[in-house]
A protein has these predicted regions:
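Acidic, Ala/Val/Gly-enriched low-complexity intrinsically disordered segments
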Residues: 4-9
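Non-catalytic, conserved peripheral segments adjacent to functional cores
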Residues: 24-129
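Conserved metal-binding segment of the jelly-roll/cupin
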Residues: 126-140
């Protein structure tokens, strides 16, 4: 959907952006249970774009209750490889990963020894162009 499709023009010629009450996101669960690729609906025009990167109502519907406790941002120079994000016990937390500039190939590895998918992984390209996000639940 393009922004032009949801712009209201008043009788005086003023333009108002009328965003729908329910902006959708596509949630696709990966082969590792609880890991989701999320594709937000993007409304774009010549001025730029608008999207919701998180909506509690939708996350609870598709993923369950998620209590995000912090928001981090990092910048990596070209060619940098980051290490595994691994936490367990009281330090574990769910993560919502997205890229605001450039692109990364993000990999989630199941390191839970008792899991039926132990040792398996999923990888996805996240970029400022595709706007995809990766949800990684606690324990990974």
């Amino acid at each position: 959907m393009r922004l032009e499709e949801i712009v209201f023009v008043s009788p005086l010629g003023l333009r108002y952006l009328c965003l729908p009450k329910y902006i959708s996101m596509k949630f696709t669960e990966q082969k590792l249970k609880g890991v989701f690729v999320i594709e937000p609906q993007v409304f774009g025009d010549s001025r730029g774009y608008f999207m919701e990167s998180y909506k509690k109502e939708l996350f609870e519907k598709y993923i369950g209750v998620v209590d995000f406790i912090q928001d981090n941002e990092s910048r990596s120079s070209y060619g940098v490889v980051r290490g595994l994000h691994f936490q367990r016990g009281e330090w574990s937390q769910s993560k919502l990963v997205r890229v605001t500039q450039g692109r990364v190939y993000d990999v989630v590895v199941d390191l839970r020894r008792t899991s039926p998918t132990f040792g398996q992984y999923v990888g996805i390209e996240l970029s400022d162009e595709n706007k995809k996000q990766l949800f990684v639940p606690r324990g990974f």
